[in-house]
Swiss-Prot record:
Top-level taxon in the UniProt lineage: Bacteria
NCBIfam families recorded: PRK00595.1, rpmG_bact
One Pfam family here: Ribosomal_L33
Protein's name according to its UniProt entry: Large ribosomal subunit protein bL33
HAMAP family registered for this protein in UniProt: Ribosomal_bL33 (MF_00294)
GO BP, sorted A to Z: translation
Organism for this UniProt entry: Renibacterium salmoninarum (strain ATCC 33209 / DSM 20767 / JCM 11484 / NBRC 15589 / NCIMB 2235)
Protein keywords: Ribonucleoprotein, Ribosomal protein
Molecular function as annotated in GO: structural constituent of ribosome
Sequence similarity: Belongs to the bacterial ribosomal protein bL33 family.
One of the record's GO cellular component terms: cytosolic large ribosomal subunit
Amino acid sequence: MAKDKDVRPIIKLKSTAGTGHTYVTRKNRRNDPDRLVLKKYDPRIRQHVEFREER
């Protein structure tokens, strides 16, 4: 069905604040080969914090 090395895999973004909150998104491996880091809202602490790609 799906290719093992998909160009746009589904990834989890985990909060660096240690709350355990995650977002699920897709990323393009050709444009972003490194681990993705985005600043997003963490509702558990009501602040914007960095979310890092989890493997």
